[in-house]
């Protein structure tokens, strides 16, 4: 698996991810890029889960985003509607964290769309570690969203064997 974390603070949203790709108990790659920019660099997305499933989810979301002119919430909801009617796609083992200047969302391989109440997202095998660290940093420091995402991902990588210290970090200021 992997760890993806998204933090929003002071007109800045960041999605960061590690680079480890595992097959069972074996590390197959350490520098994968699981965080990307979409729709004219206005949307950030990071994926965790089975690689093929994650790419399928990612590509479907990107197509919906283009179809709906970059409207994040609408693209996510419309994708979820389609998802539930497609028996083959209903059980993808993957998650997406997506964010723009207005919203942060989790999109699951089951067709669920979740908007966290505090705009903090952490998914993947190290997600609980990253979320705990990011929550503590948000509540007790004045660090930027970028600094919090980076530090929480580092902490997750120190604890989770399926998360490494190679980081891809994308940032939007709005």
Swiss-Prot record:
Recorded coiled-coil stretches: none
Reactions accelerated catalytically: ATP-dependent cleavage of peptide bonds with broad specificity
Keywords per UniProt: Allosteric enzyme, Cytoplasm, Hydrolase, Metal-binding, Protease, Sodium, Threonine protease
Keyword Metal-binding in annotation: yes
Compartments where found: Cytoplasm
A GO-annotated cellular component: proteasome core complex
Pfam families tied to this protein: Proteasome
Protein name as it appears in the record: ATP-dependent protease subunit HslV
Organism encoding this protein: Shewanella piezotolerans (strain WP3 / JCM 13877)
Lineage of the species this protein comes from: Bacteria, Pseudomonadati, Pseudomonadota, Gammaproteobacteria, Alteromonadales
């Amino acid at each position: 698996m992997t760890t993806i974390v998204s933090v929003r603070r002071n007109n800045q949203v960041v999605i960061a991810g590690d680079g480890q790709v595992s097959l069972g108990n074996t590390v197959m790659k350490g520098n994968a890029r699981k965080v990307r920019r979409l729709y004219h660099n206005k949307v950030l997305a990071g994926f965790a889960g089975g690689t093929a499933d994650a790419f399928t989810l990612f590509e479907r979301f990107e197509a919906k985003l283009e179809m709906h002119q970059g409207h994040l919430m609408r693209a996510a909801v419309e994708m979820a509607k389609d998802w539930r009617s497609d028996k083959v796609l209903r059980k993808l083992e993957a998650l997406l964290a997506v964010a723009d200047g207005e919203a942060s969302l989790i999109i699951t391989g089951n067709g669920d769309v979740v908007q966290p109440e505090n705009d903090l997202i952490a998914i993947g095998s190290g997600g609980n570690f990253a979320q705990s660290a990011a929550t503590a940093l948000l509540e007790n420091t004045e660090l930027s969203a970028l600094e919090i995402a980076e530090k929480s991902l580092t902490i997750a990588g120190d604890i989770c064997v399926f998360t490494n210290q190679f980081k891809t970090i994308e940032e939007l200021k709005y």
